[in-house]
């Protein structure tokens, strides 16, 4: 207790220094804990299912044009059932899933809900290992039935039982709730709030579900024993070949295999790169915060030496002094943690936006060990190093010039801080430049003012006429898919029937290409049936060097070549594209609005509600949809920006503390030099020389690290910037300039001070 009492007295005496420590640790802990919590969130994906080691997802590897592709979690609808039937001794159950993308809505009492939906069969919950709260999963055999999650049921019905209630799917199709299941956590690759019966697809002909088409499903297998995985994989090929012969020499073939679901998300290259970079940022920030704490503690040695000497003269052992420093560090960390909690509560929405996850999902009982480990490691580093240094000082040395021998320690800590600042600034610049590239590069069409919606009208021509007559609409068109949806795939063959590649295919009205502002580089636009437009990539892969106009594609005549444009995003390579002209389509309606766009979009949706009160028709902005494709990059940019600001503040506090300590330690020397004629510039050079010598190699290491990590991060983009060495030279110059200016500003006052004051105070 006596040690704790002396610790509190010491903390109260050094309020200014301790405030700096608290601010530094608060910032470091806040960002560091959040970064590592996000890493743990990503690495714990799909770990919530019962006996998850026995649950596998079916991977498909496509062989197109003689080339083996990457594994994808997509299957033909009959595949899971066929595998389960073929290996009954090792497989407990199987299920097939279709994810409903886009704005799928449910209405209850005329209130619109947009939950995450999937379609699956009666074995879904058994296979996945999801608890049923009420209802019989066998009800999913029947079409137009559904199960809902606990939280969705509570949100819609409160404490009332949802069983037997009817919801309107997309405001037109009644569906009956037959059961409730436990909530799916956010760190799930198959997140859903509603499960609709798979037989609904067949009844309403939503999808093709045979062996010849419809590879847009997901398949899951639950093994009886996890050790049977290799045995099952070895028997899959002959089972599938009974229905789908494997003939890669014909240009197209598929191989299926099982993979434990727990490793699918974490093994994705994009996730691995993100985890690596976030872990590096977290380590850098926490390490810098800890080193800054150590630096400030060591810098206070001159002020605290006599107090330590007095304690030792009064019988305090090295262990007593050491424990006092541990108590001091523990109290400061506790205060910092309280402030971290206050910041999290007050900036909850911003933090959840940056983390792409709720606070509750980031800090679960399963991942609580992550922040605990961060705190413990920080306590060990920040407490043990200065505690050991102070407690090991002999009494005979306490009142001498012991602090002068700590210059190496302090310069090493400064070196690490400067390295961290440069590294994070380099990463930030790479992210900013890449984000600017993918958001400002011309995309090959004009999305400005365009809004779209998916809907099947009773009369498509009448719907188009109604849209044209609206005062806020300047033009309308229609297509099978939106321009950023990726479209469906169709094999392109040569004259011998060998598949060369798969093209992205979209059907559209004749005015769609000029409506979207797509540039035609060769030929003309569509103006009749049996005509097609292809893009430059299509022509390149066909190896047509003599032009494409007039050539045949399937039963269509190519009348023009479009300039390349992304059909997904700049994450993916440019695909070959073909547009087929049709006189009438009834699926994805497009309008080009007059200015002001946002106001007119609201007016458009209000008009649609008035014209079609019994249907769910909501247009959304194409420009905003394109921006949403890069939401993860934008969030990562903001997170790195926050990390840079935090690490810069921490490092500046450490630098200022170091300079203050040097000024205090060498004040008499500076005064004597000034009395002997030293100018201000000489004093500035005296105090800043060591800092620049420390900073220069640190900045070099930081920029080199940022360069190599930046290359790794850019690997996820098909369209990416080319890193230039001179960018990193400029970054190094900027960091050195910031360090030098900070040092000059801090030293300027003492360099101009009357030397008599310093000599009198000695």
Language-model features: where?
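Membrane-helix entry/capping segments
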Residues: 1-4, 9-19, 49, 237-284, ...
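Hydrophobic alpha-helical transmembrane segments of multi-pass inner-membrane transport and secretion
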Residues: 13-41, 271-306, 334, 338, ...
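Membrane-proximal extracellular/periplasmic loop immediately following the first transmembrane helix
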Residues: 35-103, 208, 212-222, 230-235, ...
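Mid-to-C-terminal secondary-structure elements
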Residues: 121-134, 146-270, 465, 469-475, ...
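Cytosolic-side transmembrane helix boundary signature
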Residues: 382-412
């Amino acid at each position: 207790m006596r040690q704790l009492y002396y610790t509190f007295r010491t903390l109260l005496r050094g309020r200014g220094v301790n405030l700096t420590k608290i601010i530094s640790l608060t910032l470091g802990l806040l960002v560091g804990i959040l970064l590592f919590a996000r890493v743990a969130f990503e690495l714990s994906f799909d770990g919530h299912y019962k006996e998850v080691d026995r649950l596998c997802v079916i991977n498909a590897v496509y062989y197109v044009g003689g080339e083996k592709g990457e594994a994808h979690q997509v299957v033909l609808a009959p595949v899971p059932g066929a595998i389960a039937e073929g290996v009954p001794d090792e497989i407990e159950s199987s299920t097939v899933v279709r994810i409903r993308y886009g704005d799928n809505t449910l209405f209850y009492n005329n209130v619109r809900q947009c939950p995450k939906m999937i379609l699956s069969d009666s074995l879904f919950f058994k296979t996945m290992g999801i608890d049923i709260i009420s209802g019989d999963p066998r009800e999913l055999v029947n079409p137009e039935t559904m199960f809902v999650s606990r939280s969705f049921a509570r949100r819609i019905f409160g404490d009332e039982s949802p069983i037997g209630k009817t919801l309107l799917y997309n405001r037109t199709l009644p569906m009956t709730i037959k059961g409730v299941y436990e909530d799916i956590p956010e760190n799930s690759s198959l997140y859903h709030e509603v499960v609709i019966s798979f037989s609904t697809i067949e009844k309403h002909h939503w999808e093709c579900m045979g062996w010849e088409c419809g590879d847009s499903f997901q398949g899951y297998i639950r093994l009886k024993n996890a050790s049977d995985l290799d045995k099952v994989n070895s028997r899959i090929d002959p089972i599938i070949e009974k229905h789908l012969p494997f003939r890669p020499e014909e240009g197209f073939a598929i191989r299926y295999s099982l993979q434990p679901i727990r490793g699918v998300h974490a093994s994705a290259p994009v996730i691995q790169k993100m985890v690596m970079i976030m872990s590096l940022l977290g380590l850098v920030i926490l390490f810098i915060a800890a080193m800054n704490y150590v630096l400030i503690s060591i810098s206070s040695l001159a002020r605290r030496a006599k107090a330590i000497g007095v304690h030792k003269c009064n019988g305090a052992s090295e262990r007593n002094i050491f424990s006092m420093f541990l108590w001091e560090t523990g109290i400061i960390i506790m205060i910092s943690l309280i402030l971290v909690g206050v910041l999290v509560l007050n900036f909850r929405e911003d933090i959840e936006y940056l983390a792409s996850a709720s606070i509750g999902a980031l800090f679960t009982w399963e991942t609580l060990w992550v922040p605990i480990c961060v705190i413990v490691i920080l306590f060990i580093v920040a407490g043990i190093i200065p505690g050991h240094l102070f407690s090991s000082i002999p009494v005979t040395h306490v009142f001498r010039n012991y602090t002068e021998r700590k210059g190496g320690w302090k310069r090493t800590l400064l070196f690490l801080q400067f390295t961290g600042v440069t590294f994070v600034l380099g990463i930030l610049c790479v992210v900013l430049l890449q984000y600017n590239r993918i958001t400002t590069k011309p995309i090959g069409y004009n999305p400005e003012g365009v809004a779209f919606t998916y809907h099947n009208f009773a009369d498509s021509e009448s719907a188009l006429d109604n849209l044209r007559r609206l005062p806020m609409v300047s033009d309308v068109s229609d297509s099978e898919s939106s321009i950023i949806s990726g479209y469906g795939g169709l094999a392109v063959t040569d004259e011998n029937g060998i598949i060369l590649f798969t093209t992205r295919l979209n059907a559209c009205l004749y005015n769609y290409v000029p409506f979207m502002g797509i540039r035609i580089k060769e030929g003309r636009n569509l103006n009749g049936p049996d005509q097609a437009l292809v893009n430059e990539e299509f022509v390149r892969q066909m190896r047509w060097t003599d032009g494409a106009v007039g050539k045949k594609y399937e039963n269509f005549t190519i009348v023009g070549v479009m300039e390349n444009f992304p059909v997904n995003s700049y994450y993916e390579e440019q695909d070959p594209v073909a547009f087929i002209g049709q006189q009438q389509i009834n699926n994805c309606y497009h309008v080009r609005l007059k200015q002001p766009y946002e106001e007119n979009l609201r007016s458009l949706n209000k008009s649609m509600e008035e014209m079609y009160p019994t249907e769910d028709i909501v247009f959304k902005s194409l420009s905003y949809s394109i921006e949403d494709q890069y939401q993860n990059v934008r969030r990562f940019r903001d997170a790195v920006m926050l990390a840079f600001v935090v690490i810069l503040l921490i490092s500046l506090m450490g630098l200022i503390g170091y300079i203050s300590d040097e000024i205090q330690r060498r004040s008499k020397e500076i005064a004597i030099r000034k009395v002997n004629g030293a100018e201000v510039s000489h004093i500035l050079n005296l105090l800043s020389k060591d800092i620049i010598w420390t900073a220069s190699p640190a900045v070099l290491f930081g920029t080199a690290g940022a360069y190599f990590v930046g290359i790794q991060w850019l690997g996820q983009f098909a369209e990416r910037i080319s890193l230039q060495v001179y960018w990193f030279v400029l970054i190094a110059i900027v960091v050195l300039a910031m360090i030098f200016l900070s040092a000059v500003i801090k030293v300027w006052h003492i360099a101009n001070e009357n030397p008599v004051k310093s000599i009198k105070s000695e």
